[in-house]
């Protein structure tokens, strides 16, 4: 991939605006660090530009809260093309999605949508465990590019958690709504699917993910009792 790509540059700008003011859970680290790391992992693994861009954009739509009028205002202030888009949450999301398809193509947006969790159905908030089981089920039949994107996403999350545990201890797991054993179950499940199904040069991501999840399991061993840390299935991130 070229050292500079106008498409990658635009994707970074959109992600920076979309994640403005957001931080990584339990930290003061700007959230934009996550999609940038995910994109870098994908690039290093040899994935093509559409997949790298999907890594940059993978959380933009998922994290666009329906009642976040301020986020919609930020998008309009930076991107004049959104001036004519409806201001209601549904209309704005549809307009932004249409623009992303126009600028980055169906392939990139199909990848983004494949890893975007549906947090609500008919106005009902979905339980954490329900969403994660669905995500794992989708991976069982996903194509290589989707598996690579998911592996890079989870790999950076696990690496970040391990670094935070090294710095501040396993107590940092309390920042998550899911219990430590639920979190580890989900990451292990993703690693197992990717390990079985991700082939070619991108299989290195699956190997790194497997090692990272193993390191997380070691870091958490003996610190949490599954019988007391399990939370209800309504746990959400």
Locate each region found by the language model.
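Active-site helical microenvironments for divalent-metal-assisted chemistry
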Residues: 1-237
């Amino acid at each position: 991939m070229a050292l500079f790509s106008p498409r990658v540059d635009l994707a970074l700008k959109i992600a920076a605006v979309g994640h403005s003011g957001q931080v990584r859970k339990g930290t003061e680290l700007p959230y934009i660090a996550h999609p940038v790391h995910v994109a870098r992992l994908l690039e290093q693994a040899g994935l093509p530009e559409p997949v790298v861009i999907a890594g940059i954009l993978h959380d933009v739509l998922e994290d666009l809260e329906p009642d976040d009028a301020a986020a919609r205002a930020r998008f309009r202030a930076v991107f004049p093309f959104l001036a004519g888009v409806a201001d209601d949450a549904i209309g704005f999301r549809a307009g932004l999605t249409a623009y992303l398809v126009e600028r980055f193509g169906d392939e990139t947006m199909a990848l983004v949508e494949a890893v975007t969790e549906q947090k609500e159905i008919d106005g009902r908030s979905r339980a954490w465990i329900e969403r994660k089981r669905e995500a794992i089920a989708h991976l069982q039949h996903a194509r290589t590019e989707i598996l690579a994107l998911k592996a890079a996403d989870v790999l950076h999350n696990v690496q970040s958690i391990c670094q935070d545990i090294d710095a501040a201890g396993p107590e940092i797991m309390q920042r998550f709504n899911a219990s430590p054993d639920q979190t580890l179950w989900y990451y292990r499940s993703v690693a197992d699917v990717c390990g079985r199904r991700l082939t070619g040069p991108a299989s290195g991501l699956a190997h790194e993910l497997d090692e990272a999840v193993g390191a997380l399991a070691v870091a958490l061993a003996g610190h949490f009792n599954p019988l007391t840390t399990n939370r209800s299935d309504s746990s959400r991130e």
